[in-house]
Amino acid sequence: MRPNHRENNQIRPVKITRHYTRYAEGSVLIEFGETKVLCNASIEESVPRFLKGQQQGWVTAEYGMLPRATHSRNQREAAKGKQSGRTMEIQRLIARALRAVVDLEALGERTITIDCDVIQADGGTRTAAITGACVALQDAIHKLIADGVLKTNPLKGLVAAISVGIVENEAVCDLEYVEDAKAETDMNVVMVEDGRLVEVQGTAEGKPFSHMELLQLLDLADQGINQLFEVQRQALAE
């Protein structure tokens, strides 16, 4: 039996709260069950040096966990003086996912940075961050349009992500921490609205998974992400 008696294809309750903080152009608190991530989108009227004069914009992301987001306190990475490899991997993943739904030329020579801060972690922090960051990004870009800064909408749709895995020989969707800790296979799937994949990160822990199991996990991810798209649409309609 899964935690909270969920079915194998059932995601946790997901809540998206827009305009969560005052100053960011886009601000979202996303909750995947007990996992909570604050996603703030900030706009700068400049681009990184490697894009100077290229007539296009940039979307990037930063990711971090508050010291007491987990069961015991973790030292801030700023205090350590460097980011962990995990942190760098996750923020690059978030940025790639977001760029998949933005026409960078239509964005113009400006940068949107999404800061994803994990307030509380109970599995699936990177997938929650991507799903929430997409809504924050939408709000930031809609503000540029409303302010008359952009004449053409650079948004190409929604992007969302979910974790899937094999736990006790069962394929399951949206893993909580207790499931993730004992999963034989752990996979993160990022998808855009038309069903195309942006990224698939899958790893076997101890026992390899079969081609059939891979397809089963991708099918579960497709079901879960389509539910997330609906949550995003409802949030953006409010």
Swiss-Prot record:
One Gene Ontology molecular-function label: 3'-5'-RNA exonuclease activity
Transmembrane regions listed in the UniProt entry: none
Signal sequence annotation: none
Example GO biological process: tRNA processing
EC code(s) of this entry: 2.7.7.56
Catalytic reactions on record: tRNA(n+1) + phosphate = tRNA(n) + a ribonucleoside 5'-diphosphate
Superkingdom classification of source: Bacteria
Keyword tRNA processing part of the UniProt annotation: yes
SUPFAM superfamilies in alphabetical order: Ribonuclease PH domain 2-like, Ribosomal protein S5 domain 2-like
PROSITE patterns on file: RIBONUCLEASE_PH
Keywords in alphabetical order: Nucleotidyltransferase, RNA-binding, rRNA processing, Transferase, tRNA processing, tRNA-binding
Coiled-coil regions listed in the entry: none
Binding residues for phosphate: 86, 124-126
CDD domains, per the entry: RNase_PH_bact
PANTHER family reported for this sequence: EXOSOME COMPLEX COMPONENT, EXOSOME COMPLEX COMPONENT RRP41
Subunit architecture: Homohexameric ring arranged as a trimer of dimers.
Functional note: Phosphorolytic 3'-5' exoribonuclease that plays an important role in tRNA 3'-end maturation. Removes nucleotide residues following the 3'-CCA terminus of tRNAs; can also add nucleotides to the ends of RNA molecules by using nucleoside diphosphates as substrates, but this may not be physiologically important. Probably plays a role in initiation of 16S rRNA degradation (leading to ribosome degradation) during starvation.
Similarity section: Belongs to the RNase PH family.
Protein name: Ribonuclease PH
Native source organism of the sequence: Haemophilus ducreyi (strain 35000HP / ATCC 700724)
Lineage: Bacteria, Pseudomonadati, Pseudomonadota, Gammaproteobacteria, Pasteurellales
